[in-house]
Design a protein with these regions (language model features):
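Acidic/His- and Gly-rich active-site-bordering loop/insert found
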Residues: 2-126, 145-150
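Acidic-enriched catalytic cores of C-N bond-cleaving enzymes acting on peptides and small amides
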Residues: 193, 202, 223-230
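Flexible glycine/proline-rich, aromatic-decorated loop/lid segments
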Residues: 199-215
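Short small-residue beta-strand/loop micro-motif enriched in glycine and branched aliphatics
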Residues: 121-123, 218-224
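Short helix/loop capping segments that flank catalytic or ligand/cofactor-binding pockets
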Residues: 101-102, 195-196, 221-223
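Fold-independent oxyanion-binding glycine-rich loops
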Residues: 94-96, 118, 160-161, 188-191, ...
Length: 230
């Protein structure tokens, strides 16, 4: 067993022991209808940012604060930077906003009242992506509780507008470049191959926008004379 593996064993045990507490924290976050696509839910998005910040602090992250740029919904930033200047810094990303529930009559239960069925937790945001926030923070807590320190410097960035395409992300990254500077980014917002089989995703397509201009004829023509034979 390598030294790194041996050091991680008690952390994994702590994660297992704290699983129920992490699930309860996730349920509390899921109960907040932080739908970034709905302007009428702006208060809920703010409430979600408040709850996310409180949870990060409770897990031992420091200098936790909310941040906005160019009128964006609130994001949450936190950090733990005591591993030393010659140790890599890892940026952990998640988002606290969610998609609308869609046709609520098709839900078996209230989308914003999490329930456990057959060993699985159901509710809007249980996977995408409030689980990512909890996974990151619970991992930090497990390391601090067992080892007293993290093996690397850690920053956490929990976005508030991912589900609408992150329209202010460029401005946000420019304004908070120093706060988010890191050697590697870990994103807790991808898929697994199957239940119990994790996947390691190393690239995502992202989004690209643009304008398309079409030019047609100056005037109408007879389709039988100008059209081609098909």
């Amino acid at each position: 067993m390598s030294g790194a593996t041996a050091a991680a064993e008690p952390v994994l045990d702590a994660i297992e022991a704290g699983f129920d507490d992490a699930r309860l924290a996730l349920e509390d976050l899921v109960r907040i209808a932080s739908i970034s696509a709905d302007p009428d839910r702006a208060v809920d998005v703010q409430h979600s940012a408040d709850a996310t910040a409180s949870y990060l602090e409770s897990c031992g992250l420091e200098h936790v604060r909310q941040a906005t740029a160019a009128g964006s919904p609130p994001a949450v930033i936190g950090e733990w930077l005591h591993a030393g200047p010659n140790v890599p810094t890892v940026l952990l990303y998640a988002h606290h906003d969610v998609q609308p529930p869609g046709y609520e009559e098709r839900w078996t239960s209230d989308p914003f009242e999490p329930v456990v069925r057959d060993g699985r937790l159901y509710g809007r945001g249980t996977a995408d992506d409030k689980a990512g926030t909890v996974a990151h923070a619970a991992m930090v807590k497990a390391w601090l509780d067992t080892a007293g320190a993290l093996p690397c410097n850690v920053k956490v960035f929990v976005e508030g507008e991912e589900e609408i395409g992150s329209p202010h992300l460029a401005e946000f990254l420019a304004e908070y470049a120093d706060d988010l500077a890191a050697d590697v980014l870990v994103l807790a917002d991808a898929g697994n191959w199957s239940v119990g089989t994790p996947g390691l995703t190393y690239s995502l397509r992202g989004l690209a926008g643009g304008d398309v201009t079409l030019r047609a004829l100056d005037g109408p023509v007879h389709s039988g004379m100008a059209g081609g034979a098909v």
